[in-house]
Amino acid sequence: VRSFIADRTGGIPDPFTARPASRQITRAEAAAGVHIDAFRRTPLHDEHIALGARMDRFGGWWRPWHYGDHVAEYWSVREAVSLGDVSTLGKLIVSGPDAVEFLERLYPTNIADIRVGRSRYALLLNERGHLMDDGMICREAESRFVLTFTSAGASHAEMWVRDWVDTLGLRVHVLDRTMSLAAINVTGPLAGQLLERVGLSEQPRFLQHVRAEVAGVPCHVMRLSFTGEMSFELHHAVERSVELWRSLMAHGHDLGIAPHGLQALQALRLEKGNVIVGMDSELDSTPRRLGMEWAVKMDKPDFIGRSALARTAQLPDDRRLVGLTMPGMAPIEGSPIWFDHEVIGHVASSFTSPVLGHAVMLGWLKRAPFPEQVEVDGRSASVVRPPFYDPEGSRARA
């Protein structure tokens, strides 16, 4: 092609845009994964390897799936104390004179009544009222907020936030701290005792957050819970992450401390009925379909997706994410849900609960009225309202 063009034009001009050098890779390189590993690593990656972790790719990151025994990791959270690497969470700082007004438009929950030092869970919706992401809103000052997002959705959420800053023309500054801040989740009934040992004597209560030193490392300490147990997220500079991790592991040795991977976390969060965006949700999932109407304040004058939610609220309830329980082992995710000899949905997440001794699931039912008993994997399953474990939330608030 180059010769053909050169013969007829007298030469090929130099490229007018910069372009990095590239070449084809060999089959051996492709098989080995050379040059094609686009997944990021947290600053604790080598610590996980040293502890025997089986690493897997999830949400754009290499993350520990388990450390050899996911059931033992599960029990370390339920009965003692455990560490989880949550550095992969998206982290944005939104500040400026119009920060409150901007976030009121961005989120379907109330923002103005979040007090300084308090946090709130929030959904991120698009214009159609469909769930894009979720996370926490932490108010640090009257006009300064820290937002967190899911690991897989962080990049898109950042672009979404910046686009709406430009669209609304408000006086807001957005700073992405996803790669400059690491985070460790200290979770379990002995989490508070461990943190007291490493200098955090005045600990935030549930849904509060403080700036404090933990084991000599400056941290933004957020009290929340994805596991259903007492939990503290320690957000800190990436260069201090290994130091903090090792100190926590050393001080928690006699407490039975152990790290936990994603496989144990899957069981922990599922027992609490906590949704993972993109795993339990679908592209057109609304808060109503997810059973999360409580996270939407329709009495607000406006927010992204409000008009669409007002319209769809007038339509019949056509599908819903529900909890399911059944004796024995959990069926595989994606299993069809049967009722009256028809498939009426599928299992989104499933696990055999160690503490409950039976299968717990989140699944989609796509035919109203929704039955109370269905069949999954040839067995009877009950349709229930999650959470399955500690429905009052007393353990997380301890």
Language-model segment annotations:
Residues 4-19, 37, 285-398:
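Glycine-rich, small/acidic residue-mixed loop/short-helix segments
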Residues 76-87, 131-144, 174-177, 214-231:
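Residues forming anionic-ligand binding surfaces in small-molecule and nucleic-acid pockets
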Residues 3-26, 39-45, 62, 165-317:
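Glycine-rich, acidic
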Residues 1-125, 130-132:
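Acidic, proline/glycine-enriched N-terminal capping motif
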Residues 82-108, 177-196, 316-326:
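Short glycine-/aliphatic-rich beta-strand segments at the starts of folded cytosolic domains
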Residues 115-120, 154, 204-210, 331-335, ...:
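Glycine-centered loop/turn motifs
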Residues 113-167:
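Well-ordered mid-protein domain cores that form the structural environment of catalytic cofactors
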